[in-house]
Amino acid sequence: LKRCKESVWKYKGMWEDFSATVGFWADMEHPYVTYDNNFIESEWWALKQIWEKGLLYKGFKIVPYCPRCGTPLSSHEVAQGYKDVKERSAIAKFKAKGEDAYILAWTTTPWTLPSNVALCVNANEDYVKVESKGDTYYLAQALCDTVLGEGEYTVLETYKGADLEGKEYEPLYQFVSPKEKCWYVVCDDYVTLTDGTGVVHIAPAFGEDDAKVGRKYGLPLVQLVDGKGQMTPETKWPGGFCKDADKEILKDLDERGLLFSAPKFEHSYPFCWRCDTPLIYYARESWYIKMTDVKGELIQNNNTVNWLPESIGKGRFGDWLENVQDWAVSRNRYWGTPLNIWECECGHRHAIGSI
């Protein structure tokens, strides 16, 4: 804590120098210091007002999470650390139950494959069963040329995505045995035919879209990565950082004949602005402010602000408000303002508004 307090005053001086350089006016003689009780009390007061309006809640949601810092990040923090990276994606072969055929599913996060519980297709798109080079596959019709090669396949049957709903397959890994039904095809319109195979692998513990589909179908939450971002003891790669496990998982699938291909994929990926660790989208229990409930008011108020230049208010900031998400305000660390919610064993919660 002593080191943390020292850093406050170190950065106070740097902030004053920076503010003077850019011509920003502020009351430098009376700065707010986050560890000061007066500041903590002001935060508690504000949080209690939010609590009394029913806008503060505890939820189990997918959050951008830094495994090195051990804490979720807000959308503002995530926006500070994006980098363009090239990584190996995976087109995995999921064997259809009861037939000698495979469902081809694409993912940019191979480390989530051990936690797979379903495959998702778009109910309204066209899918095919094809024969290619001695093997039989299911995938989106529009992506056959891209995935298999033009003229390198024969269409055996044609379906709508909805026709495949409920089709069961054999899991790539079975490190756990969930009680809930899993390992079957589900449908959702978030699946597009822009990339991949038109079939998306679902791991509800590691993605907002996955979690939404999981809630829709009552899928189990299989979380084979711990709070440090390490693969859990149930897997073949215990203790290794999850993103570093990509290579081992791809190698393992290839050796077992369950990897169709592992194309390189360039995309923008978030890194922790504090420590430069790759973030993961991770199911965590956190406290949230229901920004989505006041979205309309935020947009209305923003329209009354005289922005200069106007494009910032209507564009960058306005676009952010249009897509605002519930704000994860709690952090899993010792340093910071204590959350003002007291919870007893019976589940009763009380919000403190002052010291």
PLM regions with names:
Residues 1-114, 166, 190, 194-353:
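Residue patterns forming the tRNA-binding/recognition surfaces of aminoacyl-tRNA synthetases
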Residues 115-121, 125-227, 254, 294:
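Catalytic alpha/beta core of large soluble enzyme barrels
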